[in-house]
Structure formats: C-alpha cells, structure tokens
C-alpha cells in the first residue's frame, strides 16, 4: 500500500472527487499530488472516516463535488466501484473529466455514459505534465462551468443542472 500523498479535502470550497482503482495507487498518487500542487482541492478515499460506512462517505463526497476526475486504467475501467461512482456522479449532474493514465479501452457501459464528456490522453506523459493539462479544465469546472457537447461551458445551478448565465 502506497503512502497517502496528502489529506483529502474536507472544507466548504469547491472540490474535485477523484475516482481511481486501489490497484493503481502507485500510479495515481503522483497525479493526485501534482494536481493538488496546482492548488486544486481533491477528495479521494483517504477522506473516508474510520468507523463510517464507506459507501455513505463516498456518496456524500460525490454529491458535494463540482467535478469527478476519473483516472482511467485497465484496473479502474474493470472496477465495479469506479463504475458505481461515475454512474452516481452523472445521475447527480456532476461532470466527469477522464484522464487516461495508460492505453485502455472503456467498457461499453462507460463509453455510453462518458460519450459526451471530453477526456485527456495522458499516456506517455508524467504526472506533472498530466496535471498541467487537467488543471485548467478542472479550475473552470470548479468555478461553476460544466462541459457541454459543443465544448462550451455553462454555469451549474445549485440544483445541479445546467443553467444559462
């Protein structure tokens, strides 16, 4: 088990929920540290309270997040937990930004759910380079924008839907 790179965010400011497979901790943690180093608040499973029902903590963190950062690998694409988190986020109008850490193909169900969301090809890049590519889109989404099919952004309303502004 790799050491946790930093505490998960627990404040009231906008934050990103990180979706990854535990099997990928060694690959994922440098990316988390690099994005966190860009000043972006991240919640990941380090934020699950001891003794709490983990599924409730995860659902609460997903509902409170402005965006989900999905670190796509063969392990995360095969993970039922990752599928559940992505489906829950999209069902609650939380946008998902996928970053491909390795060459992998999404399952048909993930392709269906994520087909209207832009992704970042991060293969061949180190964690710092990937963080540089995702920090701008994450910052825009944290400021209240949501990606649309046309690539434009709209403000999210408090109810979680898109609204014009």
Segments predicted by a language model, with ranges:
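Conserved N-terminal substructure of TIR/SEFIR domains
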Residues: 1-70, 90-94, 104-105, 137-140, ...
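C-terminal helix of von Willebrand factor
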Residues: 124-148
């Amino acid at each position: 088990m790799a050491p946790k790179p930093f505490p998960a965010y627990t404040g009231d400011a906008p934050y990103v929920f990180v979706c990854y497979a535990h099997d990928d901790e060694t690959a994922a943690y440098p990316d988390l540290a690099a994005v966190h180093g860009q000043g972006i608040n991240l919640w990941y499973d380090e934020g699950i309270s001891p003794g709490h029902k983990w599924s409730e903590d995860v659902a609460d963190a997903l509902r409170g997040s402005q965006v989900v950062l999905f670190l796509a690998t063969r392990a995360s694409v095969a993970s039922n937990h990752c599928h559940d988190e992505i489906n829950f986020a999209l069902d609650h109008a939380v946008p998902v930004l996928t970053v491909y850490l390795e060459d992998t193909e999404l399952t048909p169900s993930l392709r269906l759910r994520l087909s209207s969301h832009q992704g970042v090809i991060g293969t061949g890049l180190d964690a710092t380079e990937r963080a540089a590519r995702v920090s701008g889109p994450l910052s825009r989404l944290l400021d209240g924008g949501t990606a649309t099919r046309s690539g434009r952004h709209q403000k999210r309303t408090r109810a979680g839907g898109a609204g014009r502004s």
